[in-house]
Amino acid sequence: MISIDEYLKKVDEVIANGKYKDTWESLSQYRIPDWYKNNRFGLFVHWGCYSVPAVESEWFPRQMYQKDTKSWEWRIKNLGENGDYRQIVERFHPDKFNADEWADIFYKSGAKHIMPVSEHHDGIKMYKSELNRWNTVELTGHDYQKELHEAFDKKGLKFFCSSHRAEHLWFLNGAVENVPGSEAHGETYRDLYGPCMSFDYSKSRPGHEDGIEAPEYWLKDWLASSCEMVENNRPWGIYFDWWIYQSEFKPYIRKFLAYFYNRCDDWGYTPVVFYKNGCMMQGCAVFDVERGQINSIAKDVWQCDTAIAKNSWGYTENNEFKSPYACAVNLIDVVSKNGCFMLNVGPKADGTICDEEKNVLLKLGEWLNVNGEAIYSSEPFTVFGEGKKQQNKAFNDNLEYSDRDYRFTYKPETIYAFPMSVKERT
């Protein structure tokens, strides 16, 4: 293991010796690469220890400590009054996982880049780490990120990482607030449960968890963890969830971007970083809209991320799933507005992909085999489409299109028109 401060010395050295410094002025040299815009379609993968119960959502680790939830009830029934998340972590043994099988399915979907979650809010790293023992190499003997990276390379798919480390500061605080017998009260497993910091709920907007300020030690932890993720995985892209929009993260975000862009310069390629809620300067990274759309053509390429499942990003039993048609029209709408579409899959805890999601992926691939010319390497036309159905917000991606709704894309000498409502919706 290595200390946070020791690791951050390496980060400072890379920035000192690199092209990019940790200022917005220096980072504005960055340009979003054409390879990303031309890809237009990628996949997100939510899979980890939180997949084991298959209850509610990938937020099970938090919800299991929140009274009056299905996850709380499941915990009491299956783990006991003082049951803890460590018991779930120890049950994660995906004996049916096969990276090459995933890569084959993803390749057939027509996606060009794949982004497995590298660390979700639960704090479990899906790769080898020298900063925290709670990683899958220590837990299962597998570096799942490395295995997937190698499998994707064989298929010509670019490998991305997703980090949700920032939220671990408070994610499991219900263990301390609501379960007197939880081991989260002690220090033995502090590196698993995290700080469990509580909110001032009177200052927190619903769904934002912003009634709290991240302390310096956590900001350093986030930066070191993010840079280690880069170093150990060498991804082409990195996605951060929403909570880094807190103002105290700003200088650490700049350091991360400078580090990542400099390291990729060393490795010979230009990467992408995704952000939400205005936490990065426009042009220095790619703006992301979760489960939503915009209502105009964006000057800079942007990203929409959404899931095949309607109620969760991770696998849950009795979930409902979107149709291939619904996913295809979402892809079309995003691309017509100069966006790239990131569609999520939530494999089961055993490492298999459920039939419902596999069917959507393969059907999309069949559609793209016919229509991909109008998607890959396309540009927006002078207008994105016709009709009245449009949205300009997140968390609302279930539009019902009429036979008057069309979307357009463009290549030199060719305009592609997509009818957004069809009689056969498979």
Question: Where do the model's predicted regions map?
Answer:
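Mature catalytic domains of secreted/periplasmic carbohydrate-active enzymes
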Residues: 1-426
